[in-house]
Amino acid sequence: MQHPPCEPGNCLSLKEKKITEGSGGVCWGGETDASNPAPALTACCAAEREANVEQGLAGRLLLCNYERRVVRRCKIAGRGRAPLGTRPLDVSSFKLKEEGRPPCLKINK
């Protein structure tokens, strides 16, 4: 059984073509394979999903920068806005008078 090459869009077409049969095999466009269908293609799809997640995160970060006019790496979630990787201790110890306002930090007064 030959599987399609690892290219963008193949995982979606793969999901559309996959039909489970009553015998326990999986039908791939007319072929039946009772074993695990395509480990290499499954790994390819996992890599494609990870790339889509990273691309989505990058898109959100740029959106945050564009719409909110804040520094890159700003996370929009929850109540406050702080750069990714900022610990609460780092934020609370920031000196506002000497160093200015920290980027992406929403201060509730």
From Swiss-Prot:
Quaternary context: Interacts with MYCN and GSK3B.
Tissue spec: Expressed in the neuronal cells of the cerebrum and cerebellum, spermatocytes of the testis, pancreatic cells and also the heart. Expressed in both primary and metastatic neuroblastomas and in thyroid tumors (at protein level). Expression is associated with poor prognosis in neuroblastoma. Expressed in the fetal brain, lung, liver and kidney at varying low levels.
Keyword Mitochondrion part of the UniProt annotation: no
Primary location group: cytoplasm
Protein's job: Regulates stability of MYCN in neuroblastoma cells by inhibiting GSK3B-mediated MYCN phosphorylation. Inhibits GSK3B activity by promoting its phosphorylation at 'Ser-9'.
Keywords: Cytoplasm, Nucleus
Compartments, as annotated in UniProt: Cytoplasm; Nucleus
GO CC aspect terms: cytoplasm; nucleus
Gene Ontology biological process terms in this record: negative regulation of apoptotic process; negative regulation of kinase activity; positive regulation of cell migration; protein stabilization; regulation of protein stability
Name of the protein in its database record: N-cym protein
